[in-house]
Amino acid sequence: MAMWLKNGMSFNENGQLVRTHIKIEHGNIAAIHHEQLFEANGEDVIDVGGKLIAPGLIDVHVHLREPGGEAKETIETGTLAAAKGGFTTVAAMPNTNPVPDRKEQMEWLARRIQETAHVRVLPYASITLGQKGEELTDFAALKEAGAFAFTDDGVGVQSAGMMFEAMKRAAALDMAIVAHCEDDTLKNGGAVHDGDFARRYGIAGIPSVCEAVHIARDVLLAEATGCHYHVCHISTKESVRVVRDAKRAGICVTAEVTPHHLLLCDEDIPRLDANYKMNPPLRSRADREALIEGLLDGTIDFIATDHAPHTAAEKAKGMEAAPFGIVGLETAFPLLYTHFVKKNVFTLKQLVDWLTIKPAQCFGLQTGRLEVGAPADITVIDLETEEPIDPETFASKGNNTPFAGWRCQGWPVMTFVGGTLVWEKGRA
């Protein structure tokens, strides 16, 4: 049955925020009316009361932990967290147990997603068997089984020869290589950034060059192979410079940045709180400023959360022993809206684009836009109500966030996937 969302606000084709009414039918957007009145002909009508109607948000960097890490997260809980955060499409990283490195595992994952996911899930396949960096997977078979792209995220592919061959195979299949960039010989056994915080507490630090050197190697390999090479969670000013230079040279490279690297630097870490431990680590203030500049000038293409849930017991082990990672799906939009749009650093249109159409364009997705005929993946967002971030209310199994207590506006209140309401604020 058809349905209308009425009295919302969305961006028209000229980038202006205007009153909007959207008709949803057969899972797609059937009509969009701006300003003018419309008459419902027996269809259900939801009055969104002037709230923002945005395309469903897209996150291409999420750890759902299943299979093997169900104590931290499952496909069901992680995708419910995604829906609560306004995300209608997420891409699931392959650092699970077992790793989706064979056709049979990819097929199992596809079935599990079909059975339990609340939103669309795009599964990554690994570049190497077991993510061990020793032997390449069967890219063609994994693509046939539904792989979204190839990555060994969580570790960097250390062998240049291995990465070169991976890029050649990916390019032949018109698939992307998505890279976690760390040179293991430069990691220094670090738990935080190699900066003032590390020196103050006597903790081994991860130097910026560890990431930038790896990216520099890979962009040259991408140039040689013609592969689409995507940089995960870029974090340093040197890395931004390398990607900027590569784009100017016409190399097919894209990059993402996380909300936490835009919002925080190592100066913000209070004592030895492991909820501030992630990889890459929070870098310097100069790095943070370079990331913001890189996002604004197009060097960095979009924002992705790197949602990485862990148990409370794991994070209680302290800064050096606790695992890397924080959750992000339920806090990304409110944090970015409150601390960048409300402060006139970003425009609302820029923020929405970085979380929707930009990742969709980078990876050739059909979602991420409000257009007649497009899938009705839609998020309704309340830009006015201010609430604190409360980890105890998270849908995710993980509550490992450095943003507890931060007061934010810009909270999603309804999320639709293919025209179906999958989450609504206040509804059990």
Curated annotation (Swiss-Prot):
Which positions in this protein are listed as binding Zn(2+) 2?
153, 180, 233
Catalytic activity, EC: 3.5.2.3
Keyword Ubl conjugation (UniProt)? no
Annotated pathway, please? Answer: Pyrimidine metabolism; UMP biosynthesis via de novo pathway; (S)-dihydroorotate from bicarbonate: step 3/3
Molecular functions per Gene Ontology: allantoinase activity; dihydroorotase activity; zinc ion binding
In the record, the note on similarity to other proteins reads: Belongs to the metallo-dependent hydrolases superfamily. DHOase family. Class I DHOase subfamily.
Q: What is this protein called in UniProt?
A: Dihydroorotase
Organism source for this protein? Geobacillus thermodenitrificans (strain NG80-2)
